[in-house]
Design a protein with these regions (language model features):
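Lectin-like carbohydrate-binding module/patch detector with strong preference for beta-trefoil
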Residues: 305-365
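Aromatic-rich peripheral "rim/lid" segments of glycoside hydrolase catalytic domains that contact
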Residues: 234-309
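Residue-level detector of anion-binding/catalytic polar loops
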Residues: 32, 221, 260
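Extracellular glycoside hydrolase catalytic/binding regions
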Residues: 66-69, 73-81, 90-257
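N-linked glycosylation sites
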Residues: 6, 56, 139, 153-154, ...
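A mature extracytoplasmic/lumenal domain signature
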Residues: 37-39, 88, 135, 226, ...
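Active-site mouth of glycoside hydrolases
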Residues: 1-128, 132-143, 270, 284
Length: 365
């Protein structure tokens, strides 16, 4: 494992260095990053220890606190682009109704996480934190099964800085089951025998609506930290179209009800994989799914407003939000390599006005 067995529970320095390297690469490309404790609570893998049904909760909590103290301290200077999530799919390994005693152990771990991060210095006092309920299941987080939002008395942000974390893989027969039984979903389905008996669009809508009513409306953002559907196109030529529609509907209703969805790309691009890109070459392998997602979120970069508000037939003056100065062509020259500077301006001129040209992918140049 990557955590020492002695009472200090020291995380392997090479491992933590690699995590930081990846975080830095992401932030350098203006991405948001979520660090979580992923899989430590699985009963199905070697090395699992973060068990909500474990007999020695005192030792588990001590190890958990020590790990998050190290992580939070290492990243204390990072800004809002870095988010911490307490754990991933934590449950007792069975898929029935949650055991309330074990659920309370999850609540206790979430509280330890919040308290530890908040008192670890730097920006941690105001960092966004993600908290999952039982197995990141929507019903078991929204319903009366035992989930409790932790107190956050050490937050200095002047407002809530806790997000709720859930996953969405419904219906599982279509989304994750490695079989050829359910290969279609939604209005694109052309063979009813290939459609699961539950988990249709109306169910999806009701799930996200429940998240809004329970959390978003109370000031707690919701992140759908994982969703997706595995590739079964080798068995059904209509599978890709159905997967694309599924992605579109998840994003559409997430947007409507104030949630942020994240496709689970596990790097596997073959049969039964969730991957959208080839991670060795960077090549897109699922353009229809990517297009379905980006069609719901057409804006890009740090723009305020949608791309539909940009008139490509008009010219614009570009004002820097920090300096209040405008982008201006140095000396009004019209040759390649001419520098662009900041300059005060009272009216539009040829050297300080610009056109936006769409690249066809939701961006402009």
């Amino acid at each position: 494992g990557k955590i020492s067995s002695n009472s200090s529970y020291t995380i392997d320095s090479s491992w933590l260095n690699r995590v930081q390297q990846v975080v830095d690469m992401c932030i350098a490309n203006d991405l948001y990053v979520i660090i979580n404790m992923h899989g430590d609570g699985y009963h199905s893998v070697d090395g699992g220890w973060l068990f909500c049904d474990g007999s020695n909760q005192t030792a588990i909590r001590a190890k958990y606190k020590a790990c998050w103290k190290q992580i939070a301290t290492r990243f204390q200077s990072y800004d809002q682009h870095l988010i911490f999530e307490s754990m991933n799919e934590e449950f007792d390994g069975t898929y029935g109704t949650p055991n309330r005693t074990y659920y309370e152990n999850i609540n206790q771990l979430n509280q330890i996480f919040v308290d530890t991060v908040r008192t670890s210095g730097g920006n941690n006092a105001k960092r966004w934190l993600m908290l999952p309920g039982w197995n990141t299941n929507i019903n078991y987080t929204v319903g009366d099964y035992g989930f409790r939002v932790p107190t956050d008395n050490n937050c200095t942000a002047g407002g809530k800085r806790i997000m709720i974390s859930v996953h969405y893989y419904d219906p599982w027969g279509f989304c994750g089951e490695e079989s050829t039984t359910a290969t279609q979903w939604g209005s694109k389905a052309n063979n009813s025998s290939k459609v699961d008996s539950w988990g249709d669009e109306s169910y999806l809508k009701s799930q996200f609506n429940s998240l809004y009513n329970k959390f978003c409306s109370q000031g707690y953002p919701v992140v759908i930290g994982e969703y997706g559907a595995i590739d079964k196109s080798a068995f059904d030529s209509n599978n890709t179209a159905c997967r694309a529609e599924f992605a579109s509907k998840v994003c559409t209703y997430a947007k409507k009800y104030g949630c942020i969805p994240i496709w689970w790309d596990n790097g596997a691009t073959g049969t039964y994989g969730f991957g959208l890109f080839n991670r060795s070459t960077g090549a897109v392998t699922q353009p229809k799914i990517i297009n379905a997602i980006t069609a719901v979120y057409p804006s890009s970069g740090n723009t305020s407003g949608s791309t539909s508000s940009i008139d490509t037939g008009k010219t614009y003056m570009l004002k820097n939000v920090n300096s209040g100065l405008y982008m201006d062509v140095c000396g009004a020259k019209a040759v390649n390599g001419t520098n662009v500077i900041q300059y005060s301006a009272s009216k539009a001129k040829a050297n300080n006005t610009w056109k936006f040209v769409p690249d066809g992918k939701g961006y402009y140049y």
